[in-house]
Amino acid sequence: MFKIVDKQQLTPLIYSLWVEAPRIAQSAKPGQFLIVRPSDNGERVPLTICDYNPDNGTVRIVVQIAGVSSNKICNLNVGDCLTDVAGPLGKPSDFMEIPEEELKGKRYLFVAGGVGAAPVYPQAKYLHERGAKVDVIIGARNKDLIIMEDEMRKVCSNLYICTDDGSKGEKGVVTLLMERLGNKYDMCVAIGPMIMMKFATLMAKKLELPITVSLNTLMVDGTGMCGACRVSVAGKTMFACVDGPEFNGYDVDFDEALRRQTLYRKEEQQANAAAGLEFKR
């Protein structure tokens, strides 16, 4: 069992949990994720590792209530336990293969959409600590969905915020800020809703900027056996859980990935309705 040692509510629907998981905390790297099961009869929920502390053996996950299982996780309290936490899964971020001395002075632009700020944080932190220049864009529908602003400011050179309704930061979408910042980076990394990553990739192409995206496809087992997370990358079938979750944005068939994300929309709506849950899409 994996005990929850800290819980914070970041927004009305987003929670931060620190969980005891010593083995995972010792081996976790930026870019990797976990499969979490809240109860014996609960679903397996893929969640990116937001932070990890090898010294006290804890990992941090950020969960947005979007259905029955995520609602179960967010309703647990300090002292409660998750039934299963498997990981770390997936490949670490590509920059983990670059010698640390070569990262110093490199320029990275991170583009986070909504809860995508959570997986961006450990990557920005790792690069910042090794002397890279990190700029971060966080975009969301409104100010109530902006998370981790204070923490992000500590691990980047510049933080830019935009909201669809203009309630915080600039009014508009992340691609407008990308275009304004221009091609002055060695790499762009986009993490968030699939549609946001698609248009961030199109903007990166316009700017002639290399871009990596982290795909949040459907997942079940997290080891490549079920095939639920398959995506087309450079014309080949890849599994986001073992070949990713990060891929070259230019190679991803986003339209196919977007279609696959709606495969079980009806079943999700039925399950939410049965549990008395209602969410805006």
Locate each region found by the language model:
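Ferredoxin-reductase
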Residues: 1-80
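Structural signal for conserved beta-strand scaffold positions within catalytic alpha/beta enzyme cores
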Residues: 6, 51, 161-163, 213, ...
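A generic structural signal for residues embedded in beta-strands
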Residues: 36, 84-85, 231
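Short, surface-exposed secondary-structure boundary micro-motifs
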Residues: 39, 87-88, 234
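Short, Lys/Arg- and Gly-enriched loop/turn segments at beta-strand edges
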Residues: 42-51, 89-100, 241
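FNR/FR-type flavoprotein reductase catalytic core
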Residues: 71-220
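Local cysteine-cluster metal-coordination motifs and their immediate loop/turn environment
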Residues: 119, 194-195, 216-246
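Short Fe-S-cluster ligation motifs
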Residues: 239-243, 247-281
